């Protein structure tokens, strides 16, 4: 009996020992798993397909191209940008360097905002010290932007000078050998990054031209107003005066914009010195990118489709098909839209839930046609309809009609789109700007800022005729009453505005 009790006790002790051993093993497994996860976070490369990243041959790798070579030759800031671009390309990222400084600034703001949100989520969910550090080693004022979890952020700020010094040394090791510059003129750069003259803003041109004159003339000051100091390449139609202000005649201002005149000054100077090659940076790459974007969009969107463009919070632009609400395409940036297009832009505002603007575009023949900077036949047709309506109201007797032919298919489509945009049949077409001024002149009203309102019902005939596939569209309309006002009047909660864009 006692032996049986001892055996049972030993058996229970063995079971408990096995249980303890199993618990210890589980603890070891959990500890190892947690440690391996942290190690993986610390040792893993930035992308799954990468091996341990080696920056010893950044600009000589297959990721380097003409863009990075051009940037690297522009100095320390360009070298830093080239290394960053080459790093992203080596990691198989489908992005390209934005050569337009204005668009690049907008992308920087958008992406920094996204980085802040991602970093806040990471530090909160994971509970690790993490920061974002952005550096551009320009002198004498380098860019050093750091944000993230404290106290790591403060620690990094403390070592700012050391980090900048080490970064400059590392970039200097990879910088290409300086080339002999056989030119008296400086390269066109904005914040150390090369830029094309056609992408420089007016403010940038006004600041650059005096510096350019120092190199071209060899004088410390331009000598504004002194004919003896005027360079031979200076345009004849631009006064030899300080470029900070436009002192041309009103006729000259109407003919050529001040920004375009400033660009002409820069182009003349560089052509005189035989350095046109410095005027256009990344030009070949941008032309190829635009052609690719135009080709891809034309294949994404079916022909004869009416779409709306929507700007998303993340900076992308979506093309939404009218009627179905389906997303036809999403573009990374509005700059990807083709620029060789001309169509009238039609806006309508819904004031019930707050003012909402939607840009309309028409796709014809498989090619995207979005309103940019030119007044097309469509806008002229709408303006002509407005003039006809005014003439009918003033010169014709009650009950008479006015007939007008629209021989342009583009104009007919624009009028049809205009009618579709009006949600209420009793709404009003509101004409503004140049069109309102022209109609105002016909009615004897000299106020160019007034608005002319025309009933939408006059366009129903156009819609019916288009649906039946008839030839030239004739619009018959009864006399209407024109009203000029200082503010837009909303009819039945809707208003339609025809915006005429001029270059």
Curated annotation (Swiss-Prot):
| Reported modifications of this chain | Phosphorylation enhances DNA binding.
Residue ranges the UniProt entry marks as DNA-binding = 109-305
Which cysteines bridge via disulfide bonds?
Answer: none
GO MF, one example: DNA-binding transcription activator activity, RNA polymerase II-specific
Q: What does this protein do?
A: Transcription factor that activates the expression of the EIF2S1 (EIF2-alpha) gene. Links the transcriptional modulation of key metabolic genes to cellular growth and development. Implicated in the control of nuclear genes required for respiration, heme biosynthesis, and mitochondrial DNA transcription and replication.
| Cross-link position per record: Glycyl lysine isopeptide (Lys-Gly) (interchain with G-Cter in SUMO2) | 139
Q: Which domain of life is it from?
A: Eukaryota
Protein name stated in the entry: Nuclear respiratory factor 1
Pfam family for this entry, one = Nrf1_DNA-bind
Q: Name one GO cellular component term.
A: nucleus
């Amino acid at each position: 009996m006692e032996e049986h009790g001892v055996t049972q006790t030993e058996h229970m002790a063995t079971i408990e020992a096995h249980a303890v051993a199993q618990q210890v093993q589980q603890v070891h497994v959990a500890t190892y798993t947690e440690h391996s996860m942290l190690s993986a976070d610390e040792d893993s490369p930035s992308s799954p397909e990468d091996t341990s990243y080696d920056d010893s041959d950044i600009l000589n790798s297959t990721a380097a191209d003409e863009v990075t070579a051009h940037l690297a030759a522009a100095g320390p800031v360009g070298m830093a940008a080239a290394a960053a671009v080459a790093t992203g390309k080596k990691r198989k990222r489908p992005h390209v360097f934005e050569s337009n400084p204005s668009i690049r600034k907008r992308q920087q703001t958008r992406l920094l905002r996204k980085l802040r949100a991602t970093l806040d989520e990471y530090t909160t969910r994971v509970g690790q010290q993490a920061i974002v550090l952005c550096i551009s080693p320009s002198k004498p004022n380098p860019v050093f932007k750091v944000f993230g979890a404290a106290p790591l952020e403060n620690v990094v700020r403390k070592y700012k000078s050391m980090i900048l010094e080490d970064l400059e040394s590392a970039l200097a090791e990879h910088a290409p050998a300086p080339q002999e510059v056989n030119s008296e003129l400086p390269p066109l750069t904005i914040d150390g990054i090369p830029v094309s003259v056609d992408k420089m803003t007016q403010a940038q041109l006004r600041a650059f031209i005096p510096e350019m004159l120092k190199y071209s003339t060899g004088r410390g000051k331009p000598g504004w107003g002194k004919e003896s100091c005027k360079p031979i390449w200076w345009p004849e139609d631009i006064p030899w005066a300080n470029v900070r202000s436009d002192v041309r005649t009103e006729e000259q201002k109407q003919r050529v914009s001040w920004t375009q005149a400033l660009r002409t000054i820069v182009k003349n100077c560089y052509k005189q010195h035989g350095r046109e090659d410095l005027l256009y940076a990344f030009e070949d790459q941008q032309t190829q990118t635009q052609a690719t974007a135009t080709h891809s969009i034309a294949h994404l969107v079916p022909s004869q489709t009416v779409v709306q463009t929507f700007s998303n919070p993340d900076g992308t632009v979506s093309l939404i098909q009218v009627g179905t609400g389906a997303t036809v395409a999403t573009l990374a940036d509005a700059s990807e839209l083709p620029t060789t297009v001309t169509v009238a832009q039609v806006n309508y505002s819904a004031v019930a839930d707050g003012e909402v603007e939607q840009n309309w575009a028409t796709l014809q023949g498989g090619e995207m046609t979005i309103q940019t900077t030119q007044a097309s036949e469509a806008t002229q047709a709408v303006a002509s309809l407005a003039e006809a309506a005014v003439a009918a109201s003033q010169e014709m007797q009650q009950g008479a009609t006015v007939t007008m032919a629209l021989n342009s298919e583009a104009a007919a489509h624009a009028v049809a789109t205009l009618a579709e945009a009006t949600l209420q049949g009793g709404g009003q077409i509101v004409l503004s700007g140049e069109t309102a001024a022209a109609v105002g002149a016909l009615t004897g009203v000299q106020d160019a800022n007034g608005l002319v309102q025309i009933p939408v019902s006059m366009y129903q005939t156009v819609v019916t005729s288009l649906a039946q596939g008839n030839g030239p569209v004739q619009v018959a309309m009864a006399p209407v009453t024109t009203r000029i006002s200082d503010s837009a009047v909303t009819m039945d909660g809707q208003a339609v505005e025809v915006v005429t864009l001029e270059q």
